Design a protein with these regions (language model features):
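Hydrophobic faces of well-ordered beta-strands that scaffold small-molecule active sites
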Residues: 4-8, 35-37, 78-82, 106-108, ...
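Short acidic/histidine-rich active-site segments
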Residues: 40, 161, 224-241, 260-261
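An N-terminally biased module of ancient metal coordination in phosphate/nucleic-acid-related enzymes
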Residues: 1-91, 97-100, 165-169, 173-179, ...
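Glycine/small-residue-rich hydrophobic helix-like segments
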Residues: 186-233
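Extended substrate/RNA-proximal surfaces in nucleic-acid metabolism proteins
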Residues: 51, 55-194
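C-terminal regulatory/interaction regions
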Residues: 253-257, 262-271
Length: 271
């Protein structure tokens, strides 16, 4: 079994705490052969809805990865990626990416509700009073994901498709699903597949995977092949969490292989 964690956050992310070297050592200690660092790159200022200043400062990321390479050597394969927030202004996003390092892998993720309809609220802070409001948030989120899936920019996979469920169910006490949105999810998958993009299975640090079995089967039935696995770890304790179990889930859903990436090109591994 080839073990690779393709969604991790180091101290370069505002919500990360550990060095890349510490994260890589944790992965190595848990029997992993590969880790990809996917620190947040957000075209808006963290915790706000205002656009970040330009040019974007890539030097902290470059230095951190170089230090990890120097410390870890060839003990474990390390890839440099980012989690790019799919935000309101694609033009600004393209400017943010100017001067970026050469990435191996890019996750495209939506973390916020629309600025026009929902005030640009981060999903983490979304506190609907009832299911009607919660579903309004889900619809808004899926509309943003739909738009992003039609973007022809440079990214590898769509991150944690069913992310609102992490917050609505795990934090707010709802018991919601995406079952009412099959048409919307299918459209998103078709857009990704047509453009040669994939999805991730976000193990959600051992909680319900994002997305779950129903949607993984739909993606596979539509012809989707490109798929990665990542823990979304923001600390060393969660590195690699539930990756083994989610590999088994992929096999159950009919997948025979999964991807890692090098210089934005998928490398296939048998499940």
């Amino acid at each position: 079994m080839y073990l690779a964690d393709y969604h991790t956050h180091s101290r370069i992310s505002p919500d990360g705490k550990f060095t890349m070297a510490q994260m890589a050592q944790a992965a190595l200690d848990k029997g992993f052969q590969e880790i990809c660092f996917t620190d947040h790159v957000e075209p808006i200022n963290w915790g706000e809805t205002t656009l970040c200043p330009l040019p974007y400062n890539w030097e902290p990321l470059r230095r951190e990865f170089a230090a990890a390479q120097a410390e870890m050597g060839d003990q474990i394969t390390m890839r440099l990626g980012i989690e790019l927030d799919a935000m309101f202004d694609i033009g600004h996003t393209m400017q943010v990416l100017q001067g970026a390092p050469e990435f191996d892998f890019v996750i495209g993720s939506v973390h916020m509700l629309s600025r026009e309809k929902m005030g640009g609220l981060d999903l983490y802070f979304f506190q609907p009073e009832n299911e009607e409001q919660a579903h309004a948030g889900i619809r808004d989120y899926l509309d943003q994901v739909r738009q992003f899936a039609q973007w022809d920019g440079s990214y590898s996979v769509l991150g944690h498709l069913t992310l609102p469920l992490r917050y609505l169910n795990e934090l707010r006490g709802f018991h919601l699903t995406f079952d009412d949105y099959e048409k919307e999810v299918e459209e998103i998958f078709r857009s990704l597949i047509e453009r040669g993009r994939g999805i991730e299975v976000n193990t959600n640090r051992g909680n319900d995977p994002l997305p779950g079995e129903k949607w993984l089967r739909m993606y596979r039935d539509l012809g989707g092949e490109i798929i990665t696995l990542g823990s979304d770890a923001h600390n060393t304790a969660n590195i690699g969490c539930a990756i083994r179990q989610r590999q088994e889930l992929l096999k159950k859903c009919g997948f025979e292989k999964f991807c890692t990436f090098e210089k934005m090109v998928p490398i296939w591994h048998k499940l």
